[in-house]
Amino acid sequence: MGKKWLDIVYNEKSSVRLKEHYKNWASKYDNDLIDWGYAYPTQVKKILESNIKIKRNSKILDAGCGTGLVAETLNDMKFNNIIGLDYSVDMLKIAKSKKIYKKLIQESLSKKTTLRSNQFDVVLCTGVLTSGHVGAKAINELIRVTKDRGYLILSIAESIYEKLGFKNEIEKNNFQISKVKISKPFIALPNHESSATSKMHIYQRRLT
């Protein structure tokens, strides 16, 4: 199946079928993304080393955590208070086996979660805000659970930033968040022919 999985999950319109696709892909997901040069862990590491300064016990939400590839890098950096949230039970099983999360939650970001408001020092959402997955409205939910003065780190493909309403949703929430930095474009999966150019968007939640 290999490289076809990415096209399948990004073009799927049904959330039920999307969950089934990830169930079927879960066992090979890590190997596939590593083979494709998965860039988000490195991008997140750069941000946490250069753009924002947080303590190693900071409470971090890995929103749309999948199998925990980004959290593995966080763990290597000695962050020890990571909460993972994902829609796929099968992806979460693999994430749990890595023993790098303090807690794992099976929920969708496409609607309001059960997470308490204003609780995370950092909210990460990489490779999730995209076609076939989670739309722009989820940005409101990600802001809601971020602490005052906490950080929101999002990856968004350039091709959908305006087209799918992410630019508009971020601008509508300017009263809640201030821009820290937007990265230079990078290819999220450089070894996959379908990969798009993305940017990392870093915001800080304003005092409420």
Question: PLM ranges: what are they?
Answer:
Residues 149-157:
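Conserved beta-strand signature within the Rossmann-like core of class I S-adenosyl-L-methionine
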Residues 113-123:
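A short acidic, Gly/Pro-enriched loop at the edge of an enzyme's catalytic core
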Residues 137-148:
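A short glycine-rich, Lys/Arg-flanked "PGG" loop and its adjoining helix->strand segment in the class I
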Residues 126-127, 155:
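Residues lining the SAM
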Residues 61-112:
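Class I SAM-dependent methyltransferase SAM/SAH-binding core
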Residues 1-27:
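N-terminal, positively charged/glycine-rich alpha-helical extensions of SAM-dependent methyltransferases
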